[in-house]
Regions:
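Bacterial Sec-dependent N-terminal signal peptides
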Residues: 1-24
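C-terminal, surface-exposed recognition/capping segments
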Residues: 24-202
């Protein structure tokens, strides 16, 4: 009987500790080690599952709103530095706490350059399976973006903020990751737009 109990205990311990996708957690939110310089969250801020769209945030803002315009943007036209980890401006830090933060432009570029991107559908949601150099992966849903009160490109494109403002004197833009079924890259967005935020942790 003791052997049976010991065997069952070992099985339970293995089931709890075995994470086939390389996932782990911090402050109640899961992350995946892709073999990059930072670990990427399994979900977007405001989402409970990887395929959920989650919330949309204007750059440098930590709460959602019904309309995303130049007039109600807190950072549009304002000279800013990188906001990573600043809870007054970083939606990941403000909403998730701990060491969570928005990824920098360089970290997003690393995600593009060092990972394999496969357009797919997960539980009926279009997006990319992004597989890191170590074989682990995350799913980024094509959640679109918000301008004014409209949601654009949901299901066909994804737009994710970096923490980095544009570096060529334009105080109205910040860098973000964009993708569609035909590819992905980095671009500049008006800060007033509502984009997704996928946190990272070191």
């Amino acid at each position: 009987m003791k052997r049976v109990c010991l065997f069952m205990t070992l099985i339970c311990m293995m089931m709890v500790s075995f994470k086939p996708d390389g996932s782990d957690g911090h402050e109640g939110h899961g992350y995946v080690d892709l073999g990059l310089s930072v670990k990427w969250a399994t979900c977007t801020v405001g989402a409970s599952k990887p395929e959920d769209y989650g919330n949309y945030y204007a750059w440098g803002e930590t709460t959602t709103k019904s309309s995303y315009t130049e007039s109600n943007s807190k950072t549009y036209g304002k000279k800013m530095g990188d906001i990573a980890g600043n809870s007054s401006y970083d939606a990941a830090t403000a909403n998730w706490g701990g060491s969570w933060r928005m990824p920098t432009k360089a970290e997003m570029q690393e995600l593009i350059d060092k990972c394999t991107w496969t357009w797919t559908t997960q539980n009926g949601v279009n997006g990319y399976n992004v597989k890191g150099p170590n074989g682990n992966g995350i799913f980024l849903p094509a959640a679109g973006c918000r301008g004014g009160s409209s949601l654009d490109s949901a299901g066909s494109g994804g737009d994710y903020w970096s923490s980095t403002p544009c570096d060529y004197g334009r105080d109205y833009y910040a860098y973000g990751l964009y993708f569609g079924s035909d590819g992905q890259g980095m671009g500049d967005y008006y800060r007033c737009y509502g984009l997704s935020v996928r946190p990272v942790v070191e």
